[in-house]
Regions:
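Vicinal oxygen chelate
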Residues: 2-9, 50, 87, 91-128
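Mid-chain, well-packed structural core segment of small domains
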Residues: 75-84
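Short glycine/serine/proline-enriched coil/turn segments at secondary-structure junctions
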Residues: 67-70
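N-terminal beta-strand motif that seeds the catalytic metal site of vicinal oxygen chelate
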Residues: 1-24, 74-76, 126-128
């Protein structure tokens, strides 16, 4: 038996938060294009909009007047149900893929930008 180091065992990602300038425009992108559902907020902050995927994973959109400058490697990653279909949809509606490729485990990925310039990764299922 392998001895576990002192650590907190995590099960899954609960939510990620993205800072946006226009929550309505961002909801069109995340709900309309990526399939999130708008759900009731569980906090008393009118500047945070809660979205959820069928898996239960959540995205919180925090609306501010000025979204902070972020390094290019900071992003949220979402697994596509069908990677090829997702790529075709993005091509069809004119959303450009900034970078794409295949990782060592065979997982394919592509990066796009949301309406506020936040980097978003769309990926296939992990190969591990």
């Amino acid at each position: 038996m392998v001895d576990k180091p002192n650590r907190v065992d995590l099960k899954t990602i609960n939510h990620v938060l993205t800072v946006v300038k226009d929550v309505k425009k961002s909801m069109e992108f995340y709900c309309g294009l990526l399939g999130f559902k708008h759900i009731q907020s569980m906090v008393d902050n009118p500047d945070i909009t809660w979205l959820q995927l069928p898996s239960g994973a959540m995205l919180h959109l925090h609306e501010t007047d000025t979204a902070p400058v972020k390094p290019d490697n900071v992003h949220n990653a979402f697994e596509a149900a069908d990677f090829d279909s997702a790529k075709q949809t993005l091509d069809k509606i004119g959303i450009s893929v900034e970078r794409s490729g295949t990782r060592n485990d065979g997982q394919r990925f592509m990066f796009i930008r949301d309406p506020d310039g936040n980097l978003v990764e769309i990926c296939a299922a992990s190969g591990f």
